[in-house]
Design a protein with these regions (language model features):
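Short alpha-helical transmembrane segments in multi-pass integral membrane proteins
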Residues: 1-20, 78-143, 187-241, 297-364, ...
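Residue-level signal for short hydrophobic patches within transmembrane helices
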Residues: 9, 13-32, 36, 59-66, ...
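Interfacial/gating helices of multi-pass transporter permease domains
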Residues: 18, 41-61, 127-132, 192-193, ...
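Transmembrane helical elements of multi-pass membrane transporters/channels
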Residues: 18-37, 139, 173, 202-206, ...
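Helix-terminus/linker motif at the lipid-water interface of multi-pass membrane proteins
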Residues: 28, 32-50, 120-127, 183-190, ...
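Small-residue-rich hydrophobic transmembrane alpha-helices
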Residues: 50-110, 147-166, 271-335, 369-383, ...
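Hydrophobic transmembrane alpha-helices of multi-pass small-molecule transporters
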Residues: 62-65, 177-181, 206-211, 281-284, ...
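Short runs within selected transmembrane alpha-helices of multi-pass transporters and secretion channels
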Residues: 71, 140-158, 166-174, 195-208, ...
Length: 448
């Protein structure tokens, strides 16, 4: 057995831990991009500039989730063929997806750049931060193809059991981003534009190096393959489209929630934006475990080692419980200090109250998010996308309905009160579907 095949040979808990830890660290450093922007802008420019950057977060997440969802479709098939040692089909999927998604990313970037002001206006962005928010967003969309390509390549690496290379690249680009943020924002005084430009350059460097390293990595599997295969593209889209719909629709929902928050004013938005950054950091621990479970399940399914799938699921749940406890302790003891990193000295009492209340509420219920993500990861790995999509839509419906109906009448707290209820409902639906779909040793749910 090759050392690349440890996901189908090592003990499930050991394999998932080894595989997931670089992904968790990588996800953390990916969030450092946005955190560096927010902290440095908040400290050196002010809370209004922080609100401008934060106002873009919900919209940029929609486009990021399109990239992540597209990567899921390719990643599940790459893992399946890798586990089955069908390297010809694996390389065909890799080439087909890179060509297709490169074109898509350019089109999406051009669309986002051209309609930045319209989209921010539709979100009811406060007038005093609208121009800065649009500027940040337009610079972001110039670099969107780099971000899209990096996310696709990162999924490819993890699909073949390699999670350390994306980690190394992210550490490098994150450090580069922080230094350029400090130079452009603090020294040159470029404000929001400097923060966006620093992120663009760092993401571009990461994408280029990822592409070159991945090309070199693929030389290990010497076989004939097709540069573009329409049939394989259709198979990939069968998995990718539900995932894109799920991820982008949830982000659109969060964008609608952002529109609910905006009328509460710039300071409330600053507090909300600060905690959204913190939520992204902690939630990525659970997202990474879910993302690690998918290739684990898919590789073992491709290798016809279906008895290992349920053991891997239990191992993922154990990891989620540990991380939920860690998140609770950190938030409960340090929530004020964490808020001050983003809000700085000119953050008002309202901004600190919104940030602290939202953050502590999340800390109590992160366990629901963890078990939801692990269950969703198994469904993706098995290619069972319909219940996965339905469960996430129910999650979104709960969050949106409470925010839209109750927040304008009874206060901003209702924006986050329904979050854990949505996570729990999502888990229950996904788990019910999973119990009916466990493969056995005689059944293989391969996509063919």
């Amino acid at each position: 057995m090759s050392k690349d095949e440890y996901l189908i040979t090592d003990k499930p808990l050991k394999a998932l831990t080894i595989f997931a830890m670089p992904m968790i660290l990588g996800s953390f450093f990916q969030q450092v991009y946005n955190m560096a922007d927010s902290i440095i802008v908040g400290q050196f420019v002010g809370s209004s500039a922080l609100a401008a950057v934060g106002a873009c977060a919900a919209l940029t997440n929609v486009f990021i989730c399109v990239a992540l969802g597209a990567g899921v479709g390719a990643g599940v098939l790459v893992s399946r063929y890798f586990g089955a040692r069908n390297y010809s089909k694996m390389k065909t999927i890799v080439s087909t997806s890179l060509i297709s998604f490169c074109v898509l990313s350019i089109l999406l970037g051009a669309f986002g750049f051209g309609f930045s002001r319209l989209m921010m206006s539709l979100l009811q962005t406060p007038a005093d931060i609208l121009d800065e928010a649009v500027l940040y967003l337009q610079v972001y969309f110039v670099g969107f193809p780099f971000l899209f390509m990096y996310n696709i390549l990162s999924t490819m690496f993890t699909s073949i059991g390699e999670s350390k290379i994306p980690l190394g690249l992210l550490i490098f680009s994150s450090v580069l981003n922080i230094f350029m943020d400090l130079w452009m924002v603090a020294d040159l005084g470029l404000g929001v534009f400097g923060a966006a430009l620093a992120t663009l350059i760092a993401q571009g460097v990461s994408a280029v190096f990822s592409f070159l390293i991945f090309l070199y990595r693929m030389r290990r599997y010497k076989c004939r393959y097709r540069w573009f295969d329409r049939q394989e593209l259709q198979l990939m889209l069968r998995i990718a489209i539900p995932s894109v719909l799920q991820q982008s629709t949830v982000s659109i929902g969060m964008m609608i929630v952002q529109a609910v928050v905006n009328p509460f004013g710039t300071q409330a938005l600053a507090g909300y934006a600060a905690t959204m950054r913190v939520e992204n950091v902690f939630s990525l621990m659970f997202v990474s475990i879910g993302n690690a479970v998918s290739p684990y399940v898919s590789q073992n399914l491709g290798a016809n080692k279906t008895s290992r799938i349920k053991k891997g699921y239990c191992a993922a749940l154990l990891l989620d419980i540990c991380f939920a406890a860690f998140a609770f302790i950190v938030i409960e003891t340090l929530h004020t200090q964490i808020s001050s990193l983003f809000l700085g000295k000119d953050g008002t009492a309202l901004a600190y109250q919104v940030s602290g209340d939202y953050m502590r509420w999340l800390g109590y219920f992160f366990i629901f998010m963890g078990i939801k993500m692990a269950t969703d990861g198994v469904l993706r790995g098995l290619g069972i996308m319909r219940p996965f999509l339905i469960a996430n839509m129910v999650n979104l419906a709960i969050r949106l309905s409470v925010a839209l109906i109750f927040a304008p009448r009874f206060g901003i707290a209702f924006v986050w009160l329904a979050v854990p209820a949505g996570w729990l409902a999502n888990f229950l639906i996904s788990y019910a579907a999973l119990r009916k779909s466990w493969p056995n040793d005689e059944t293989e749910r391969a996509v063919s």
